[in-house]
Each structure stands twice: as C-alpha cells, then as structure tokens.
Design a protein with these regions (language model features):
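Short, well-ordered secondary-structure micro-motifs within conserved domains or adaptor modules
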Residues: 44-49, 53
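Short, well-ordered alpha-helix to beta-strand connector turns
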Residues: 7, 43-45, 101
C-alpha cells in the first residue's frame, strides 16, 4: 500500500528544505521524494502534512534505555526485578520512537538487559 505525504515542508537531513514536495511511502520504505506535480493522479492514501515538516529519523548517541529519569537511577534499578527493568526499557524505547528518534546507542544499564530489549525491538 502506498501513502503520499504532502502539504508541509520536507527536510532532507543534509540542509535542504523543500516546499511543494511530496514523500511517497510504499509499505515501510520511502520510494520517492519529488515536486507535487510528479504525483498527479496518485490514487492511494494521502496524508496532509500542512503546518508540519517531514524529516529523517533522529539518532540519539547517548541513552540508558533502562533508566526512567529517577534522581538516583542505579539505586532504583537495584530495587527492580529484571522483568520490571525490561518492561520499563521497552516503554522507554516506544516513547523514544514516538518522539522521532529512530536509532539509539545505549551506554549501559544493568545485567546487559538492554541487549534483550534491542533484540525484542529488532524482531
């Protein structure tokens, strides 16, 4: 199924901002970015992005996915069972993605549980 996103700005991630362009997505992949005129006759799903900007997914190179903002995160983790830590980390991963961050580099948590979270997210 193809979806055309159009109406707002398109930022390409290397410094260019485009007006009057559309972004065509087939399934999970971007298949085209072009002036809106190139999409005349498109009959698939259309999403109006007016008053918005489409941009590539962001990368956060310093996260601790198992932490949830506690004042003393290491002590807090010691009170939790591994299953609770993994559930919290999965929730944090989902929040991260919903905020536009599509890639992270985790710098450690507890008992390497972040690797289980990585594997679950990648499956």
């Amino acid at each position: 199924m193809s979806t055309l996103y159009s109406g707002g700005l398109v930022f390409d991630g290397i410094g260019n901002m485009f007006e009057n362009h559309g972004v065509l997505v087939d399934g999970q992949k971007i298949s085209g970015i072009a002036p809106l005129g190139d999409f005349e006759g498109f009959s698939g799903e259309k999403v109006d992005t007016s008053d918005g900007t489409l941009l590539p997914g962001l990368i956060d190179c310093h996260v601790h996915i198992v932490y949830s903002g506690e004042a003393d995160p290491k002590s807090h983790l010691l009170k939790l069972k591994p299953g609770q830590i993994v559930i919290n980390a999965l929730e944090n991963a989902q929040k991260t993605l919903l905020n536009g961050i599509t890639s992270i580099r985790d710098l450690g948590g507890r008992d390497f549980l972040e690797f289980a979270v990585r594997d679950a997210c990648n499956s």
